[in-house]
Amino acid sequence: MKALILVGGYGTRLRPLTLTQPKPLVEFANKPMMLHQMEALAEVGVDTVVLAVSYRAEQLEQEMTVHADRLGVKLIFSLEEEPLGTAGPLALARKHLEGDAPFFVLNSDVICDFPFKQMVEFHKNHGKEGTIAVTKVEEPSKYGVVVFDQDKGKIDDFVEKPQEYVGNKINAGLYIFSSKILDRIPLKPTSIEKEIFPEMAFSGNLYAFVLPGFWMDVGQPKDFLKGMSLFLNHCHTTKSDKLETGSNIHPTATIRGNVMVDPSATVGENCVIGPDVVIGPRVKIEGGVRILHSTILSDSSIGNYSWVSGSIVGRKCHIGSWVRIENICVIGDDVVVKDELYLNGASVLPHKSIAVNVPSKDIIM
Protein backbone atom coordinates (compact mmCIF):
# COMPACT_ATOMS: atom_id res chain seq x y z
CA MET A 1 0.00 0.00 0.00
CA LYS A 2 0.88 3.65 -0.36
CA ALA A 3 0.17 6.75 1.71
CA LEU A 4 0.22 10.51 1.23
CA ILE A 5 0.84 12.80 4.20
CA LEU A 6 -0.37 16.39 3.90
CA VAL A 7 2.58 18.21 5.41
CA GLY A 8 1.10 21.65 4.71
CA GLY A 9 2.66 25.06 5.07
CA TYR A 10 4.40 27.16 7.66
CA GLY A 11 3.06 25.73 10.93
CA THR A 12 2.11 29.20 12.17
CA ARG A 13 -0.14 27.88 14.95
CA LEU A 14 2.81 26.11 16.60
CA ARG A 15 5.24 29.00 16.47
CA PRO A 16 7.87 29.68 17.77
CA LEU A 17 8.77 25.96 17.62
CA THR A 18 8.24 25.95 13.84
CA LEU A 19 10.49 28.94 13.18
CA THR A 20 13.55 26.67 13.27
CA GLN A 21 12.13 23.43 11.84
CA PRO A 22 9.09 22.21 9.89
CA LYS A 23 6.13 21.26 12.07
CA PRO A 24 6.30 17.50 11.26
CA LEU A 25 9.81 17.42 12.74
CA VAL A 26 8.83 18.97 16.09
CA GLU A 27 9.41 16.38 18.81
CA PHE A 28 6.20 14.86 20.17
CA ALA A 29 6.83 12.25 22.88
CA ASN A 30 10.52 12.21 21.96
CA LYS A 31 10.23 11.60 18.23
CA PRO A 32 9.24 13.77 15.26
CA MET A 33 5.46 14.11 15.00
CA MET A 34 5.44 12.60 11.53
CA LEU A 35 7.45 9.57 12.64
CA HIS A 36 4.54 8.36 14.81
CA GLN A 37 2.44 8.22 11.63
CA MET A 38 5.13 6.64 9.47
CA GLU A 39 5.82 3.88 11.98
CA ALA A 40 2.11 3.05 12.19
CA LEU A 41 1.83 3.00 8.39
CA ALA A 42 4.85 0.70 8.08
CA GLU A 43 3.27 -1.71 10.57
CA VAL A 44 0.33 -2.33 8.21
CA GLY A 45 2.51 -2.85 5.16
CA VAL A 46 2.71 0.62 3.63
CA ASP A 47 5.94 0.65 1.63
CA THR A 48 5.68 4.04 -0.12
CA VAL A 49 4.92 7.37 1.55
CA VAL A 50 4.43 10.56 -0.46
CA LEU A 51 5.05 13.78 1.47
CA ALA A 52 3.05 16.69 0.04
CA VAL A 53 5.32 19.59 0.98
CA SER A 54 5.54 23.28 0.22
CA TYR A 55 8.00 24.48 2.88
CA ARG A 56 11.49 23.43 3.99
CA ALA A 57 11.44 20.27 1.91
CA GLU A 58 15.23 19.88 2.19
CA GLN A 59 15.12 19.78 6.00
CA LEU A 60 12.32 17.23 5.94
CA GLU A 61 14.14 15.08 3.41
CA GLN A 62 17.37 15.15 5.38
CA GLU A 63 15.79 13.86 8.60
CA MET A 64 12.89 11.71 7.46
CA THR A 65 14.85 9.76 4.83
CA VAL A 66 16.94 8.22 7.62
CA HIS A 67 13.81 7.05 9.43
CA ALA A 68 12.20 5.83 6.20
CA ASP A 69 15.26 3.72 5.37
CA ARG A 70 15.12 2.15 8.83
CA LEU A 71 11.43 1.32 8.36
CA GLY A 72 11.90 -0.03 4.83
CA VAL A 73 9.67 2.70 3.39
CA LYS A 74 10.28 4.53 0.12
CA LEU A 75 9.88 8.27 0.62
CA ILE A 76 8.70 10.49 -2.26
CA PHE A 77 8.56 14.28 -2.03
CA SER A 78 5.80 16.04 -3.96
CA LEU A 79 6.61 19.74 -3.94
CA GLU A 80 3.81 22.30 -4.32
CA GLU A 81 4.87 25.41 -6.22
CA GLU A 82 1.70 27.11 -4.94
CA PRO A 83 -0.73 26.16 -2.13
CA LEU A 84 -3.12 23.51 -3.44
CA GLY A 85 -5.41 23.11 -0.44
CA THR A 86 -6.21 19.69 0.99
CA ALA A 87 -7.23 17.94 -2.26
CA GLY A 88 -4.92 19.50 -4.88
CA PRO A 89 -1.85 17.66 -3.52
CA LEU A 90 -3.50 14.34 -4.44
CA ALA A 91 -3.82 15.48 -8.06
CA LEU A 92 -0.20 16.65 -8.05
CA ALA A 93 0.98 13.27 -6.75
CA ARG A 94 -1.41 11.27 -8.96
CA LYS A 95 1.28 9.25 -10.73
CA HIS A 96 2.58 8.01 -7.36
CA LEU A 97 -0.86 7.01 -6.03
CA GLU A 98 -2.53 5.35 -9.03
CA GLY A 99 -3.04 1.59 -8.96
CA ASP A 100 -5.41 -1.14 -7.85
CA ALA A 101 -4.68 -0.87 -4.12
CA PRO A 102 -6.31 1.77 -1.90
CA PHE A 103 -4.07 4.39 -0.33
CA PHE A 104 -3.99 6.37 2.91
CA VAL A 105 -4.12 10.16 3.19
CA LEU A 106 -3.19 11.72 6.55
CA ASN A 107 -3.09 15.21 8.00
CA SER A 108 0.33 15.55 9.60
CA ASP A 109 -1.01 17.25 12.76
CA VAL A 110 -2.99 14.24 13.97
CA ILE A 111 -1.95 12.01 16.85
CA CYS A 112 -3.96 8.95 17.92
CA ASP A 113 -3.61 5.17 18.22
CA PHE A 114 -3.64 4.90 14.39
CA PRO A 115 -5.85 1.78 14.03
CA PHE A 116 -4.90 1.44 10.38
CA LYS A 117 -5.43 -2.33 10.19
CA GLN A 118 -9.08 -1.96 11.25
CA MET A 119 -9.52 0.97 8.85
CA VAL A 120 -8.28 -1.10 5.91
CA GLU A 121 -10.64 -3.96 6.78
CA PHE A 122 -13.58 -1.54 7.09
CA HIS A 123 -12.73 0.07 3.75
CA LYS A 124 -12.47 -3.25 1.93
CA ASN A 125 -15.75 -4.46 3.45
CA HIS A 126 -17.83 -1.53 2.19
CA GLY A 127 -16.04 -1.48 -1.18
CA LYS A 128 -16.70 2.17 -2.05
CA GLU A 129 -14.34 5.03 -2.96
CA GLY A 130 -13.52 6.53 0.41
CA THR A 131 -13.31 6.05 4.18
CA ILE A 132 -13.04 8.93 6.63
CA ALA A 133 -11.96 8.28 10.21
CA VAL A 134 -14.26 10.19 12.57
CA THR A 135 -13.88 10.89 16.28
CA LYS A 136 -16.29 11.85 19.05
CA VAL A 137 -16.13 15.38 20.51
CA GLU A 138 -17.84 16.90 23.54
CA GLU A 139 -18.90 20.15 21.85
CA PRO A 140 -19.89 19.37 18.25
CA SER A 141 -21.20 22.93 17.70
CA LYS A 142 -17.57 24.08 17.41
CA TYR A 143 -16.80 21.75 14.50
CA GLY A 144 -18.01 20.40 11.21
CA VAL A 145 -20.06 17.33 12.08
CA VAL A 146 -20.17 14.17 9.94
CA VAL A 147 -23.71 12.75 9.70
CA PHE A 148 -23.73 9.04 8.84
CA ASP A 149 -25.62 5.77 9.19
CA GLN A 150 -24.62 4.43 12.60
CA ASP A 151 -24.96 0.79 11.51
CA LYS A 152 -23.27 0.69 8.11
CA GLY A 153 -21.23 3.90 8.25
CA LYS A 154 -22.46 5.47 4.99
CA ILE A 155 -22.05 9.25 5.17
CA ASP A 156 -25.17 11.29 4.43
CA ASP A 157 -24.11 14.86 5.09
CA PHE A 158 -21.63 17.33 6.59
CA VAL A 159 -22.96 20.08 8.86
CA GLU A 160 -20.64 22.98 9.72
CA LYS A 161 -20.90 24.13 13.37
CA PRO A 162 -24.50 22.94 13.90
CA GLN A 163 -26.69 24.99 16.23
CA GLU A 164 -28.97 22.00 16.78
CA TYR A 165 -27.69 18.52 17.61
CA VAL A 166 -27.15 16.39 14.50
CA GLY A 167 -24.32 14.21 15.81
CA ASN A 168 -21.05 14.32 17.74
CA LYS A 169 -18.53 12.86 15.29
CA ILE A 170 -16.06 15.01 13.35
CA ASN A 171 -13.51 14.43 10.60
CA ALA A 172 -10.33 13.07 12.23
CA GLY A 173 -8.01 13.82 9.29
CA LEU A 174 -7.24 10.18 8.40
CA TYR A 175 -8.55 8.72 5.13
CA ILE A 176 -8.40 5.70 2.82
CA PHE A 177 -9.28 6.13 -0.85
CA SER A 178 -9.45 4.04 -3.97
CA SER A 179 -7.66 5.55 -6.95
CA LYS A 180 -11.06 6.52 -8.44
CA ILE A 181 -11.03 9.62 -6.24
CA LEU A 182 -8.17 10.99 -8.34
CA ASP A 183 -10.59 11.48 -11.25
CA ARG A 184 -12.61 13.87 -9.08
CA ILE A 185 -9.75 16.20 -8.16
CA PRO A 186 -8.44 18.94 -10.48
CA LEU A 187 -4.83 20.13 -10.33
CA LYS A 188 -5.64 23.45 -8.69
CA PRO A 189 -6.32 24.71 -5.15
CA THR A 190 -9.16 22.47 -3.95
CA SER A 191 -10.65 21.62 -0.55
CA ILE A 192 -11.21 17.92 -0.03
CA GLU A 193 -13.55 18.62 2.88
CA LYS A 194 -15.76 21.24 1.19
CA GLU A 195 -15.61 20.30 -2.49
CA ILE A 196 -14.79 16.60 -2.86
CA PHE A 197 -16.34 14.90 0.18
CA PRO A 198 -19.90 16.30 -0.26
CA GLU A 199 -19.86 15.11 -3.87
CA MET A 200 -18.70 11.63 -2.81
CA ALA A 201 -21.29 11.44 -0.04
CA PHE A 202 -24.09 12.47 -2.43
CA SER A 203 -23.18 9.57 -4.73
CA GLY A 204 -23.01 7.10 -1.81
CA ASN A 205 -19.25 6.58 -2.08
CA LEU A 206 -18.05 7.80 1.32
CA TYR A 207 -18.10 5.93 4.63
CA ALA A 208 -17.21 6.82 8.23
CA PHE A 209 -14.93 4.70 10.41
CA VAL A 210 -15.33 5.55 14.11
CA LEU A 211 -11.93 5.86 15.78
CA PRO A 212 -11.59 3.96 19.03
CA GLY A 213 -9.53 5.56 21.77
CA PHE A 214 -7.90 8.97 21.89
CA TRP A 215 -7.39 11.56 19.14
CA MET A 216 -5.99 15.08 18.97
CA ASP A 217 -4.96 17.63 16.38
CA VAL A 218 -1.71 18.83 17.96
CA GLY A 219 -1.16 21.81 15.66
CA GLN A 220 -1.24 24.44 18.40
CA PRO A 221 0.43 24.56 21.86
CA LYS A 222 -2.63 23.97 24.05
CA ASP A 223 -3.68 20.98 21.98
CA PHE A 224 -0.09 19.75 21.72
CA LEU A 225 0.05 19.48 25.52
CA LYS A 226 -3.43 17.91 25.68
CA GLY A 227 -2.45 15.41 23.01
CA MET A 228 0.72 14.58 24.94
CA SER A 229 -1.37 13.85 28.04
CA LEU A 230 -3.71 11.59 26.05
CA PHE A 231 -0.76 9.81 24.43
CA LEU A 232 0.94 9.17 27.77
CA ASN A 233 -2.31 7.89 29.27
CA HIS A 234 -2.71 5.55 26.29
CA CYS A 235 0.83 4.26 26.88
CA HIS A 236 -0.09 3.65 30.53
CA THR A 237 -3.38 1.85 29.85
CA THR A 238 -1.82 -0.37 27.18
CA LYS A 239 1.20 -1.02 29.43
CA SER A 240 3.47 0.23 26.67
CA ASP A 241 7.22 0.18 27.19
CA LYS A 242 7.27 3.73 25.77
CA LEU A 243 6.83 5.08 29.31
CA GLU A 244 10.52 4.64 30.01
CA THR A 245 12.03 6.59 32.87
CA GLY A 246 15.68 5.81 32.15
CA SER A 247 18.47 5.03 34.59
CA ASN A 248 19.81 8.55 35.10
CA ILE A 249 17.16 9.63 37.61
CA HIS A 250 18.47 10.45 41.08
CA PRO A 251 17.11 8.06 43.73
CA THR A 252 15.69 11.00 45.72
CA ALA A 253 13.68 12.26 42.73
CA THR A 254 9.93 11.56 42.61
CA ILE A 255 8.04 10.50 39.49
CA ARG A 256 4.29 11.18 39.62
CA GLY A 257 1.78 9.79 37.12
CA ASN A 258 2.58 9.27 33.45
CA VAL A 259 6.10 10.43 32.65
CA MET A 260 8.43 9.70 29.73
CA VAL A 261 12.14 10.36 30.27
CA ASP A 262 14.60 9.62 27.49
CA PRO A 263 17.35 7.23 28.67
CA SER A 264 20.02 9.83 27.81
CA ALA A 265 18.41 12.52 30.01
CA THR A 266 19.39 13.14 33.65
CA VAL A 267 17.13 14.14 36.55
CA GLY A 268 18.77 15.56 39.68
CA GLU A 269 18.15 15.04 43.37
CA ASN A 270 14.86 15.95 45.04
CA CYS A 271 13.11 16.73 41.75
CA VAL A 272 9.38 16.10 41.40
CA ILE A 273 8.45 15.18 37.83
CA GLY A 274 4.89 14.63 36.60
CA PRO A 275 2.17 14.05 35.88
CA ASP A 276 2.07 14.27 32.08
CA VAL A 277 5.70 15.15 31.41
CA VAL A 278 8.03 14.26 28.54
CA ILE A 279 11.77 14.87 28.95
CA GLY A 280 13.75 14.60 25.74
CA PRO A 281 17.17 13.25 24.74
CA ARG A 282 20.23 14.66 26.55
CA VAL A 283 18.12 16.99 28.70
CA LYS A 284 19.66 17.88 32.07
CA ILE A 285 17.33 18.60 35.00
CA GLU A 286 19.23 19.90 38.02
CA GLY A 287 18.26 19.52 41.69
CA GLY A 288 14.93 20.43 43.27
CA VAL A 289 13.12 21.09 39.98
CA ARG A 290 9.32 20.69 39.67
CA ILE A 291 7.90 19.87 36.22
CA LEU A 292 4.26 19.05 35.45
CA HIS A 293 2.06 18.92 32.33
CA SER A 294 5.03 19.98 30.17
CA THR A 295 7.57 18.79 27.64
CA ILE A 296 11.28 19.62 27.60
CA LEU A 297 12.73 19.08 24.13
CA SER A 298 16.18 17.70 23.36
CA ASP A 299 19.49 19.12 24.61
CA SER A 300 17.94 21.63 27.03
CA SER A 301 18.72 22.18 30.71
CA ILE A 302 16.65 23.32 33.68
CA GLY A 303 18.49 24.94 36.61
CA ASN A 304 18.14 24.21 40.32
CA TYR A 305 14.75 24.75 42.01
CA SER A 306 12.95 25.91 38.87
CA TRP A 307 9.26 25.26 38.17
CA VAL A 308 7.80 24.42 34.74
CA SER A 309 4.04 23.89 34.42
CA GLY A 310 1.82 23.52 31.35
CA SER A 311 4.55 24.66 28.95
CA ILE A 312 6.84 23.62 26.10
CA VAL A 313 10.59 24.25 26.31
CA GLY A 314 12.28 24.01 22.91
CA ARG A 315 15.58 22.44 21.92
CA LYS A 316 18.96 23.60 23.24
CA CYS A 317 17.45 25.99 25.80
CA HIS A 318 19.02 26.89 29.12
CA ILE A 319 16.59 27.73 31.90
CA GLY A 320 18.33 29.21 34.94
CA SER A 321 17.82 28.50 38.64
CA TRP A 322 14.71 29.55 40.60
CA VAL A 323 12.80 30.27 37.37
CA ARG A 324 9.00 29.84 37.20
CA ILE A 325 7.47 29.08 33.79
CA GLU A 326 3.73 28.42 33.51
CA ASN A 327 0.42 28.92 31.70
CA ILE A 328 1.28 27.58 28.23
CA CYS A 329 4.63 29.25 27.74
CA VAL A 330 6.25 28.18 24.48
CA ILE A 331 10.01 28.68 24.50
CA GLY A 332 11.64 28.55 21.06
CA ASP A 333 14.93 26.79 20.35
CA ASP A 334 18.22 28.03 21.78
CA VAL A 335 16.72 30.42 24.37
CA VAL A 336 18.44 31.43 27.61
CA VAL A 337 16.29 32.39 30.60
CA LYS A 338 18.33 34.00 33.36
CA ASP A 339 17.99 33.06 37.06
CA GLU A 340 15.02 34.01 39.27
CA LEU A 341 12.61 35.05 36.51
CA TYR A 342 8.86 34.55 36.05
CA LEU A 343 7.34 33.74 32.64
CA ASN A 344 3.54 33.60 32.43
CA GLY A 345 2.06 32.55 29.08
CA ALA A 346 5.09 33.85 27.18
CA SER A 347 5.92 32.94 23.60
CA VAL A 348 9.69 33.38 23.19
CA LEU A 349 11.23 33.42 19.73
CA PRO A 350 14.40 31.36 19.09
CA HIS A 351 17.89 32.51 20.07
CA LYS A 352 16.70 35.05 22.67
CA SER A 353 18.18 35.77 26.09
CA ILE A 354 15.52 36.66 28.68
CA ALA A 355 16.68 38.83 31.57
CA VAL A 356 13.37 40.34 32.80
CA ASN A 357 10.07 38.93 34.05
CA VAL A 358 7.18 38.33 31.64
CA PRO A 359 4.22 38.56 34.05
CA SER A 360 1.44 38.40 31.43
CA LYS A 361 0.91 36.76 28.05
CA ASP A 362 3.34 38.26 25.55
CA ILE A 363 5.47 37.49 22.50
CA ILE A 364 9.17 38.05 23.16
CA MET A 365 10.87 39.00 19.90
Swiss-Prot record:
Assembly behavior: Component of the GMPPA-GMPPB mannose-1-phosphate guanylyltransferase complex composed of 4 GMPPA subunits and 8 tag-335/GMPPB subunits; the complex is organized into three layers, a central layer made up of 2 GMPPA dimers sandwiched between two layers each made up of 2 tag-335/GMPPB dimers. Catalytic activity of tag-335/GMPPB is reduced when part of the complex and binding of GDP-alpha-D-Mannose by GMPPA induces allosteric feedback inhibition of tag-335/GMPPB.
Annotated residues for binding of GDP-alpha-D-mannose: D109, D217
Reactions catalysed, as given in the entry: alpha-D-mannose 1-phosphate + GTP + H(+) = GDP-alpha-D-mannose + diphosphate
Natural source organism: Caenorhabditis elegans
Protein name: Mannose-1-phosphate guanylyltransferase catalytic subunit beta
MF term (GO), any: metal ion binding
Domain notes: The N-terminal substrate-binding domain adopts a Rossman-like fold and has a binding pocket for GTP or GDP-alpha-D-mannose. Substrate binding is coordinated by an Mg(2+) ion.
Residue numbers spanned by region Substrate-binding domain: 2-221
Function: Catalytic subunit of the GMPPA-GMPPB mannose-1-phosphate guanylyltransferase complex. Catalyzes the formation of GDP-mannose, an essential precursor of glycan moieties of glycoproteins and glycolipids. Can catalyze the reverse reaction in vitro. Together with GMPPA regulates GDP-alpha-D-mannose levels.
